[in-house]
């Protein structure tokens, strides 16, 4: 992703914040900083948008949300690219979180209940579920399924 870090046998909190108008309103050389990546609450990367970019247009296509694999622009898996790892919490928010908010969520992930007005969806993945094809999120609006090789690791 443009930076490297060693995390073998360590839990790492990763947060990606995007806003086409500029995360925190930040603009660099007249171009909005559209993406910031935080690792363990510290800013690791900030990227400007392209100056010739088109405005974001939402669509109603059902595009799979994936973790630990690469996707092409058409939402197809890229070969056999994948990463081994564990995931404990996954949250998608409507609002672009500040660094302080990211650090708070990193320190208290259990504080996310599903009733937050700007939470789109979220999963707490610290215990096995009864159906790997229908894992309900915290909001009760969405479900996920596990595809490929996986194993549940409880309370890690």
Question: What are the functions of these language-model segments?
Answer:
Residues 44-86, 114-120:
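Flexible glycan-contacting loops in extracellular carbohydrate-active proteins
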Residues 20-23, 42, 71-74, 92-100, ...:
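Acidic glycine-/aspartate-rich tracts in secreted/extracellular proteins
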Residues 10, 31-33, 62, 83-88, ...:
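Residues that flank catalytic or metal-binding motifs in active/ligand-binding sites
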Residues 1-54, 150-156:
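Extracellular glycan-interaction surfaces
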């Amino acid at each position: 992703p443009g930076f490297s870090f060693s995390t073998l046998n360590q839990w790492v909190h990763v947060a990606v914040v995007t806003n086409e108008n500029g995360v925190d309103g930040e603009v660099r050389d007249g171009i909005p900083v559209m993406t910031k990546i935080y690792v363990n609450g510290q800013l690791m990367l900030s990227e400007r948008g392209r100056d010739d970019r088109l405005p974001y247009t939402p669509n109603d296509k059902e595009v799979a949300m994936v973790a630990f694999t690469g996707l092409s622009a058409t939402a197809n898996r890229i070969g056999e690219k994948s990463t081994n790892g564990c995931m404990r919490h996954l949250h998608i928010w409507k609002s672009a979180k500040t660094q302080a908010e990211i650090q708070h969520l990193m320190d208290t992930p259990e504080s996310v209940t599903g009733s937050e007005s700007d939470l789109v969806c979220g999963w707490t993945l610290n215990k096995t579920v009864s159906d790997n094809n229908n894992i309900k999120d915290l909001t009760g609006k969405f479900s996920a399924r596990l595809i490929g090789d996986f194993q549940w690791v409880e309370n890690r």
